[in-house]
Amino acid sequence: MASRFMTDPHAMRDMAGRFEVHAQTVEDEARRMWASAQNISGAGWSGMAEATSLDTMTQMNQAFRNIVNMLHGVRDGLVRDANNYEQQEQASQQILSS
């Protein structure tokens, strides 16, 4: 018996919402981490140690930004694909009913 793949646009949009929540969580945590790093940056650190710490934190902040962008890309793709599926389904229904 052949299996059939069923697409559920509503479930796709629900999952897109979850990706948005994950993206917001990553963004919030990255912001907290950056603020914490800024607070300890001047606490007894100077010269090369402070510059290295700031460079590391800047790289980590960019990495988190990349993760957020990827999560948003998945979210956008799910919504786009759900919309496309619904449009194609409606077009198919119109063709079949005529």
From Swiss-Prot:
Its main location: secreted. Signal peptide: none annotated. Disruption phenotype: EsxJI deletion mutant shows extremely slow growth in broth cultures. Keywords: Secreted. Disulfide bonds: none annotated. GO terms for cellular component: extracellular region; peptidoglycan-based cell wall; plasma membrane. It holds the Pfam family WXG100. InterPro entries: ESAT-6-like_sf (IPR036689), T7SS_ESAT-6-like (IPR010310). It is found in: Secreted. Induction: Differentially expressed under different growth conditions. Belongs to the WXG100 family. CFP-10 subfamily. This is ESAT-6-like protein EsxJ. It comes from Mycobacterium tuberculosis (strain ATCC 25618 / H37Rv). The gene is esxJ.
